């Protein structure tokens, strides 16, 4: 396989040329939203220039909008491994889509039926189910997270499942600590008791190939702005389930899960983001492993991205573990790195995550601090009263030089920790 050409990748992202006080910006904020390649920017601009009209009309720009809508649904279906574009529904963001469809899903449930959520999940895959359960008189059971390695406690899952379980809501990967859950196994156990599975793949989508059929997901949601696109929510639903569920709309129609006029410019950008990822796969193709279609190109591209990112993450983890008073929360054993994304959740003995993030930001290094709406997890780890964690998120446009710069900056901040703490 050809070596991963990160320099060519970086040339596609205009934001990577930004500077802060004379130094290049280094973006480790990807889990909160990635930068976008030039083709995504161009696609959004081109839509407004050449196609700006509502859909369904008998004139040029409206027909072009129709084409964008159809092509975006098809491309996002390829990204997720859906059987048909009809299984893809688009909305403002993952949270809004989940809130919307949760009402449809729970409408078929009876009081006393049960929903299972987890303590490892983002609130977007917890809160909507709690609200729907309160409205319908449902019982909510919670799968625990193991504090030692911050993975799901599957024994707790087995205890939560029962004859009245109707839905299991689980994340593919933790946006806070990077843990990858055994989604296929969780789905197998859920289906064994007759429950549907709703997967939050927001954090996983930019880092690895997603295949809804391989993991037997009944629903899966993600957001394009996390995989190098614009702000747009994406929902996959098994077609037979979607067609059977009631929907909450003024007048249900074929597009009943997509309320109001669509964000067509966002769909144009999401289409371009998918094509960008597929292009990486096409470049990675060899005569021994040719790429035959867009889905194959996406799998090849995201596989190459994962290999590169995890090599970079090993460099980051090695460096963090050498820093005194520093702890990585989550999977740290190198032989288990297949079960994590390149996202590090870090705490420090004598400095708050906020202080460290601000000090890094003053040097042009972007990170996040807090709980990232993984509220239950941060509480489970006992970190809610300590400001959560510093989150360092790698993406495929990061470099070894950027990682080294981050580590050097952290070493300086920690060495001067009394001054840093006083100044932030």
Give names to the regions the model predicted:
Residues 1-424:
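Pyridoxal 5′-phosphate
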């Amino acid at each position: 396989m050809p070596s991963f050409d990160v320099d060519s990748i970086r040339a596609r992202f205009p934001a990577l040329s930004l500077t802060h006080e004379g130094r290049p910006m280094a973006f480790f904020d990807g889990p909160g939203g990635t930068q976008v390649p030039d083709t995504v920017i161009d696609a959004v601009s081109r839509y407004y220039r050449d196609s700006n009209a509502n859909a369904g009309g008998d004139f040029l720009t409206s027909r072009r909008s129709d084409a964008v809508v159809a092509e975006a649904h098809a491309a996002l279906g390829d990204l997720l491994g859906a059987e048909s574009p009809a299984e893809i529904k688009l909305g403002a963001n993952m949270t809004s889509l989940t809130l919307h469809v949760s009402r449809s899903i729970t409408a078929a449930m009876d009081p006393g039926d049960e929903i299972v959520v987890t303590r490892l999940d983002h609130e977007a895959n917890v809160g909507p189910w709690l609200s729907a359960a309160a409205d319908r008189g449902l019982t909510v059971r919670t799968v625990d997270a193991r504090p030692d390695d911050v993975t799901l406690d599957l024994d707790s899952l087995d205890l939560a499942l029962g004859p009245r379980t109707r839905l299991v809501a689980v994340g593919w990967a933790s946006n806070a600590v990077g843990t990858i859950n055994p989604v296929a196994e969780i789905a197998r156990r859920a289906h064994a008791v007759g429950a549907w599975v709703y997967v939050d793949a927001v954090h996983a989508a930019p880092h690895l190939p997603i295949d809804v059929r391989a993991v037997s997901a009944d629903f899966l949601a993600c957001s394009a702005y996390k995989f190098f696109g614009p702000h747009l929510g994406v929902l996959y639903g098994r077609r037979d389930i979607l067609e059977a569920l009631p929907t909450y709309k003024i007048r249900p129609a074929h597009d009943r899960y997509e309320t109001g006029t669509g964000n067509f410019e966002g769909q144009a950008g999401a289409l371009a983001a998918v094509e960008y990822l597929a292009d990486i796969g096409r470049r990675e193709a060899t005569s021994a492993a040719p790429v035959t279609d867009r889905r194959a190109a996406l799998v090849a591209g995201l596989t190459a991205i994962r290999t590169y990112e995890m090599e970079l993450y090993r460099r980051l983890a090695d460096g963090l573990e050498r820093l005194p008073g520093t702890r990585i929360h989550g999977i740290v054993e190198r032989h288990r790195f297949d079960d994590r994304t390149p996202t590090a959740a870090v705490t420090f003995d004598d400095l708050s995550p906020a202080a460290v993030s601000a000090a890094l930001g003053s040097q042009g290094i972007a990170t996040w601090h807090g709980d990232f709406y993984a509220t239950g997890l941060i509480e489970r780890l006992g970190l809610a009263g300590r400001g959560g964690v510093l989150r360092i998120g790698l993406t495929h446009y990061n470099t070894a030089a950027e990682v080294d710069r981050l580590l050097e900056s952290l070493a300086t901040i920690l060495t001067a920790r009394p001054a840093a703490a006083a100044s932030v």
